[in-house]
């Protein structure tokens, strides 16, 4: 298989605290260039350009730039979105507000929920299609034009056209979209069935509303970034990460902007799947601890788990395929505090990039997880990134003592240790959510730890959860950026049938699968991005008649038969619930096809590139320092420079492994080895305590 070595390849990921860049550059020392710069919240494009400059990368000399952005996610969470109007079927304007049976508060007549589109911007027109796609009421075209005029007068920038049962017959929606664009060419227009051709009008409507609300925001951002790159000589197509773990050409990204929500965590899981599988661990739990939060995911047989049900917040379900990631508010910048009851809390509030942890010297005054690691000797105060004004360890310890230690009657060191214990407990809970809660024993997986802070906590987390192996990739602090580099192009398609197998026309299933694949192939070819091949992954959503929950069933290549569908569903249902229900009819609900443009593989060894390798592990030791460990207290601990470790280097804990983008803690009783791809493989003595 060929390797992507022609030219320079750049992956750049924007996180809540840092913007990370990796450039595979054959002309650079070690074949790689790296950068980590503070995220520019006001305009993320500035941070991307700053990262290129910091890495010494000339955009005009780059073969491909792949970008992961939090623009859409942040816009939704902060409600800094475009003013959006809705044109919907008469009688259904309040679907987006009524939702399902859940409510933001358990008691009271009102809650704090505010729909993404306020009621005065939700307008109705006469039209009606039934669930079989039959037209009951013709589309009132004059009503559509009147609604367009009203929304324009109300200051809308974006419009959603969302009609009942449009998944079964798109004719009315398509005609209405034509009318909107003719009457209002400058508006951003979203058709619900184009974003999600699936039943359930509430989820389809909210997903389309999210797309419309962030579409102008993402388009403006990508235009700014593309313009800045062009000024620096970049003439190729910019690729953008999506939440499904694939990439899309920037020119198409804004049309389906909702697909970029949660793309940052997805890129990390994609990199983890790529790297862990190559290291011999196709089953892995991913653990990404950054500056603001921690993201945990599951990889099974080398593939990340994909789901299509994300509730970004109450009343905002997003039903497009996304890498399944569980997020908690525990990152390096998470603030530790004493609550009203006198108890120690850690997160979810974060110091962010500004002012950041106390030790960054940017004016931060609240103790964070990073500050606790510094006080306990796990971080080197002289090698912290992005420090504006140096702050001594004693200064940080004094603040932890005053804010945490004194109220609890603890020393500064004891208080810092307590901060780490609580943070680790929260992270262990997240791991249990993606493993035990879904029928997977974490002891059967490796823990793949990355992010700027992940390797600091990974071995303690593995010990707590009895996970026998920890994989620390070559560049843990920029793994999300590496995910951008290794990700394939991807486009997802869905159609609803919602038909019992006994009544199903299997030829219709085959036809829809072929149409989905053809649409994906055409889109990838239109993107004009070099790929080795195009492949399709098919799956179906099924349930037993009368059930509300749906089970995703993967299909092999080729066209499935009815007996094959029934057998695969029965097997999947047994594996998930250990129940057989032969007396109830199975129902095929949705057909899914993911079409991937497989890009040339990236040689992982290039990511570990270094011209500083020593002959032995001992020669890579650059010093020693006093480090606190659970159960033993302070130990005089060797510090290894990771860039100097030779391939095959093996050593026992306690140890600190320092590198440009992260610090790894190896606990007493654990052992580590560096493999050929630069991964640090840690063996945890399960059942032993330190």
Located regions from the model:
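Short, ordered loop/turn segments at secondary-structure junctions
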Residues: 89-91, 164-166, 194-195, 243-245, ...
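C-terminal, non-catalytic interaction/recognition modules in large multi-subunit enzymes and RNPs
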Residues: 4-6, 14, 142-150, 154-155, ...
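Conserved phosphate-binding/catalytic loops in two-lobed NTP-binding clefts
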Residues: 183-207, 466-482
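Glycine-rich phosphate-binding loop of actin/hexokinase-like ATP-binding domains
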Residues: 21, 26-29, 33-40, 85-91, ...
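Conserved phosphate-binding loops in N-terminal lobes of ATP-dependent enzymes
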Residues: 11-14, 18-22, 33-44, 63, ...
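Structured core elements
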Residues: 11-13, 20-23, 66, 75-78, ...
């Amino acid at each position: 298989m060929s390797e992507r070595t022609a030219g320079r390849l750049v992956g750049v990921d924007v996180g809540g605290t840092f913007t990370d860049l990796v450039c595979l550059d054959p002309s650079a020392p070690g074949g790689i260039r790296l950068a980590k710069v503070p995220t520019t919240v006001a305009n993320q494009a500035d941070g991307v350009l700053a990262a290129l400059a910091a890495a010494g990368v000339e955009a005009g000399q780059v073969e491909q730039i792949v970008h992961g952005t939090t623009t859409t996610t942040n816009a939704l969470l902060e409600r800094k979105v475009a003013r959006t109007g809705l044109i919907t079927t008469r009688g259904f304007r309040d679907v987006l507000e009524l939702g399902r049976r859940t409510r933001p508060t358990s008691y009271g007549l009102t809650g704090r929920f505010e729909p993404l589109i306020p009621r005065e911007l939700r307008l109705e027109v006469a039209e009606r299609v039934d669930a079989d796609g039959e037209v009951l009421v013709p589309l009132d075209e004059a009503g559509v034009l009147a609604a367009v005029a009203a929304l324009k007068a109300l200051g809308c920038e974006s419009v959603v056209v969302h009609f009942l049962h449009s998944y079964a017959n798109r004719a009315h929606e398509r005609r209405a979209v034509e009318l909107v664009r003719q009457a209002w060419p400058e508006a951003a227009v979203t058709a619900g069935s184009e974003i999600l051709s699936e039943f359930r009008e509430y989820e389809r409507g909210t997903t389309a509303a999210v797309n419309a609300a962030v579409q102008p925001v993402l388009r403006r951002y990508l235009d700014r970034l593309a313009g800045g790159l062009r000024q620096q000589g970049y003439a190729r197509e910019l690729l953008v990460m999506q939440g499904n773990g694939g990439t899309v050409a920037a020119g198409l990204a804004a049309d389906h902007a909702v697909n970029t929500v949660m793309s940052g965590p997805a890129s990390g899981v994609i990199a983890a799947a790529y790297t862990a599988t190559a290291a011999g661990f196709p089953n892995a739990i991913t653990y990404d601890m950054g500056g603001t939060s921690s993201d945990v995911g599951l990889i099974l047989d080398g593939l990340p788990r994909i789901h299509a049900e994300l509730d970004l917040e109450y009343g905002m379900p997003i039903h497009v395929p996304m890498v399944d990631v569980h997020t908690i508010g525990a990152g390096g910048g998470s603030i530790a505090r004493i609550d009203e009851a006198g108890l120690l809390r850690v997160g979810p509030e974060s110091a962010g990039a500004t002012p950041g942890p106390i030790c960054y010297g940017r004016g931060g005054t609240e103790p964070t997880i990073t500050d606790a690691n510094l006080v306990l000797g796990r971080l080197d105060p002289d090698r912290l990134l992005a420090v504006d004004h140096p702050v001594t360890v004693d200064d940080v310890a004094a603040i932890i003592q005053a804010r945490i230690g004194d109220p609890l009657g603890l020393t500064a060191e004891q208080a810092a240790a307590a901060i780490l214990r609580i943070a680790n407990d929260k992270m262990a809970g997240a791991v249990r959510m993606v493993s035990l809660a879904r029928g997977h024993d974490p002891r059967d997986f490796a823990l793949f730890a990355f992010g700027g802070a992940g390797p600091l906590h990974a071995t303690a987390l593995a010990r707590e959860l009895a996970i026998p192996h920890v994989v620390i990739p070559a560049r843990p602090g920029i793994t999300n950026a590496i995910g951008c580099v290794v990700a394939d192009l991807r486009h997802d398609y869905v159609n609803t049938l919602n038909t019992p197998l006994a009544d199903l026309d299997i030829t219709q299933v085959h036809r829809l699968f072929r149409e989905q694949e053809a649409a994906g192939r055409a889109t990838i070819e239109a993107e004009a991005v070099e790929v080795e091949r195009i492949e399709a992954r098919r799956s179906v959503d099924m349930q037993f008649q009368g059930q509300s929950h749906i089970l995703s069933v993967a299909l092999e290549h080729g066209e499935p038969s009815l007996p094959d569908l029934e057998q695969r569903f029965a097997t999947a249902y047994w594996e998930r619930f250990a129940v057989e229900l032969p007396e109830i009819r199975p129902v095929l609900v949705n057909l899914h096809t993911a079409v991937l443009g497989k890009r040339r593989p990236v040689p992982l060894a290039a990511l570990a590139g270094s011209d500083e390798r020593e002959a032995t592990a001992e020669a890579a030791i650059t010093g020693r320092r006093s480090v606190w460990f659970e159960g033993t207290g302070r130990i005089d601990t060797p510090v290894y420079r990771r860039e100097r470790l030779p391939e095959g280097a093996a050593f026992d804990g306690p140890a600190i492994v320092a590198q440009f983008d992260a610090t790894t803690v190896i606990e007493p009783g654990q052992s580590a080895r560096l493999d050929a791809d630069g991964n640090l493989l840690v063996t945890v003595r399960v059942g032993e305590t330190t």
